[in-house]
Each structure stands twice: as structure tokens, then as C-alpha cells.
Amino acid sequence: MLIERGLLSIMASKCSGTWSTYKTYTTANGCPFMKPEGPPADGRTLALNDHHLVESLAHFNREKIPERAVHAKGAAAYGEFEVTADISDICNIDMLLGVGKKTPCVTRFSTTGLERGSAEGMRDLKGMATKFYTKEGNWDWVCLNFPFFFIRDPLKFPSLMHAQRRDPRTNLLNPNMYWDWVTSNHESLHMVLLQFSDFGTMFNWRSLSGYMGHAYKWVMPNGSFKYVHIFLSSDRGPNFSQGEQAKDNSDLDPDHATRDLYEAIERGDYPTWTANVQVVDPAEAPDLGFNILDVTKHWNLGTYPKDLPKIPSRPFGKLTLNRIPDNFFAEVEQLAFSPSNMVPGVLPSEDPILQARMFAYPDAQRYRLGPNHHKIPVNQCPMTFNPTLRDGTGTFDANYGSLPGYVSESQGVNFARPQEHDPKFNAWLSQLSSRPWMQTNENDYKFPRDFYNALPEFRSQEFQDKMVENIIASVAQTRREIREKVYHTFHLVDPELSARVKRGVEKMDASFKQVSLSRL
């Protein structure tokens, strides 16, 4: 027993990064070994009985783990979250109760669609996920830099991602695939326009804002609740890469956003974000003019649509990142997030995309990191107690010792009270369920139309013009039948937008033909 405790103590010290007492080079089993260079000391030829060589090569072959199915490329930093305003009137979450309360956290920024080696400056959604190590468990805020998404039907997600990835025949990016999918799924048009604006090419991670997109429920002790949408706005303000600048950033330094983040933190220029919450009383939800559970629409902050109610935000906290991880693989590549990681006082809404993500994210981590991914130090909550989750690949702790693999009151286990809410607050859901809101509807054209027409006002005319130019450059690479579908689809949004895209594509075609003829 004493030997076992001693070994556990040594293992704990190693896991904590205390290596000062372990200076002798060894093989994997701890056997001291000579310097790992050159042929065997006795001059014999290399053979499989050279245990150190076999061990080194075999381990090298297994260094890589599956990359993330989405958000493959990323960077992370540690920091803290501080409550800056009293929101106890709408919130019963321990982490957010008490102005000045601080919680340690880690934030990972990422690209979305392409592989781990892709350039950070490419036109793409960007991820911003934060894990808060609270006293009541780990709470994950899994955000994108856009406040809405392409789809509201989770069955469409695999096809959406495949359409944005590489052609299975050539392994090249293929605009035909992307625009063919868009023109068959009109609920995506709101997101498409935002993606092709300069919002789609953010310059660095420090300027990125993160939006949960989904509605969650903040539940009070009496069972009442509010629908909420949380977002983190960069205190630096947005910083866009435009046109050739975005291409230059990707070509010259595909890791420029990560480099910028790490260099800023190392020189003490810590990036900060303001946490905001938008609140909707369930009784008011039917009167907003759109479905707050439809993640293809945003909660209007006053920019657009002008004819729909504004849903103001309340600032309540400050996120500061101030430390770079010591080891990328251990602390960034193995970092695992999920929208299902919540704490008391929070419940998911009925948003079908949110509910699908609550399964898909942990399942992706089980595939990528194993069934015990929650025990990896960067993911671990020190208060975790669940002896039903035991054994399996990656079990390197005491595995709950001799405790049985079930729980009951007779074991002296404490259980939290059920987190319930008053069903009368869900009355409007019965109205919602009677409407076929998964089908394409007028709001699927209204929101992108209002975004397009509002751009000159809340950004600039130049911002709108560049968005159209970016669309033209992409559509011009497609086949003629795809182009015709694009023109028709954009006509449903705004005839002027459709006409501008068509004129621009035809102009590019004419210029290309002229250049081709001049080379004859």
C-alpha cells in the first residue's frame, strides 16, 4: 500500500509538470539509457532487438491523434473572467453572482471548415470557445464569430460541411459544390452574405467577438426562467483583413492570428472581451416577429431588421487572457469543449441545432481523445464524482478505487436537486410546434435582404460593395448552370443584389476571354 501511494505521488508530481528531479534519460519503462544518437555502441548492425530504436520509431508513428472534425486549427490561452455587474435579477448561476468574483478559464480560437494546416486568414467562420473552471463544474461557452448559422435542421450539418470542404475527386476547393448547396438551402442566405463580407476574414484572434448563437435558459429558484443569448465583444473592436490583404496574410504567414495573440500576451498586452447577455421573457417570444429558437436568425441589437423589436444587451463581465499554454498538444490539442457542459442555473433551449450539438461534441471528443477525455488535466474538473464513468482507454487515475460502479443514497452520496422550470412559461412552444418552421419561409429572405440594405448604414457603402465583389469572385468560378441558380436565389433576396452579381460575373467572363484571345 505504501509503495502504491509512493508511485501515485511520483505520478502526480510528473503530471503537474515537476521534472527537476528526473534528469537521467530513460526508455519508456524508466530504464536508464545512453544518448539516443548513432549506431549501437558495439558496432553491430541495427536489428529489432535494439529495443530503444523500436520503441522510438513505434512511438513516433503514433504521435498524431485524429484532428477535430470541425475547428481543426486553433490556438488557446489561459485567463480569468470577472463579474462586473449585478445580474441577480435574471441569473442564479454561482459564477455570475457577486460583482468582482473571478473564475479561471481557458479560451481556444479556431478556424472552422478546413484542416489543421489551413491558413487562419481564409474566408471562414471562426470559433471562440471558453471553458470556465467554476466551483459547480466546468461551464463551456462555445461561440462563433457570427451571431447566427447556416442551418436550423441538424440533419443538414454533414452536407453543409462537405459542401465547404475539398472535392472528393481532386481534393481541391470547389466553388461549384458550395454554391450548389447554398442555392438548395435558402435558410443559409443570411449567413452566406455575412460570410462574404469582411466579417468573414478577421485579421487576428484578439479582435474576434464570440456569439453563442443559441438561446439558453437561465432558471431562477422559483422555476421561472428567461431565454438568454450570451456574446463576448472584443474590447479592441473588429479588425478585418480586406481583399488582397487577406490573401497576403494567408500566403506569407498562415499562422498570423496565433502569432499575434501569443506575442501580445508575452509583452503584457493582454486581450480583453466584454461579456453581454440579451434577455427574452418567454411570454414575449411570440411577439418578436421571428422564432428565437431558429439559429439562422439573430437577436436584433438595433441594426436590422428595423421593423422588428430590438433586444438590448446587458454587459456583465470581463474576460482577460494573460497566459500562453506550456505545451500545445497537452493543453490545446487535447482541449475539449461541448455546449452540454453547463452548471446549475442553466438549461438548454429547444433549439434543435443546440440539442444536436450537445450530442455531437462529446461524441467527437470520445472518438478523438477517448472515453476518458474529461480526465485529461486541461479538461478535468476537480469536483467530478461519478463512479459510473470508469475504465476504458485513457484511465490513468485511481479509477474510483473499490467503489462500486453505481451510486445510491446508502453510499452517502449527495445528489443535486432536480433543476426544473415552471411549465406555464413554455406555453408558446405549443404554438410553435404547430408551425412548419423547418421549411423555407419569408424570414429566410427578409433577414439577408435587411442585412444587405442596412450595410451602408451600420458599416459603409464600401463594405457592401466589397461583399458583392467577394461573391462575384467566387461565383465566377462556377459552371453556368450553377450561376443561373445563384442569380435566381439572390433575386429572391433582393433583385438589385442579383443584378449586381450577374453583371460582375459577366464582366469577369468578358475580361477573361479578352485576355485569352490576346495570348493567341
Swiss-Prot record:
For this protein, the record's SMART domains field holds: Catalase (SM01060)
What is the active site of this protein?
Answer: H71
Q: In which pathway does it act?
A: Alkaloid biosynthesis; ergot alkaloid biosynthesis
Q: Which UniProt keywords apply?
A: Alkaloid metabolism, Heme, Hydrogen peroxide, Iron, Metal-binding, Oxidoreductase, Peroxidase
- Phenotype reported upon loss of the gene: Accumulates the intermediate 4-dimethylallyl-L-abrine.
Please give the record's induction comment.
Answer: The expression of the ergot alkaloid synthesis cluster which leads to the synthesis of fumigaclavines is positively regulated by the brlA and stuA transcription factors.
Q: Which GO terms describe its cellular component?
A: cytoplasm; mitochondrion; peroxisome
What molecular function terms (GO) are annotated for this protein? catalase activity; heme binding; metal ion binding
The reply to whether Disulfide bond figures as a keyword in the UniProt entry is no
Applied value in biotechnology: Ergot alkaloids are known for their toxic effects on humans who consume contaminated grains or livestock that graze on grasses harboring ergot alkaloid-producing fungi. Due to their strong affinity for monoamine neurotransmitter receptors they may also have clinical uses such as treatment of migraines, Parkinson's disease and cerebrovascular insufficiency.
Q: What is its EC number?
A: 1.11.-.-
- For this entry, list what GO says about its biological process: fumigaclavine C biosynthetic process; hydrogen peroxide catabolic process; response to hydrogen peroxide
Q: Which residues bind heme?
A: Y361
Which cofactors are named for this entry? Answer: heme
Q: What does this protein do?
A: Catalase; part of the gene cluster that mediates the biosynthesis of fumiclavanine C, a fungal ergot alkaloid. DmaW catalyzes the first step of ergot alkaloid biosynthesis by condensing dimethylallyl diphosphate (DMAP) and tryptophan to form 4-dimethylallyl-L-tryptophan. The second step is catalyzed by the methyltransferase easF that methylates 4-dimethylallyl-L-tryptophan in the presence of S-adenosyl-L-methionine, resulting in the formation of 4-dimethylallyl-L-abrine.
Q: Hey, which family's this protein in?
A: Belongs to the catalase family.
Could you identify this protein by its name?
A: Catalase easC
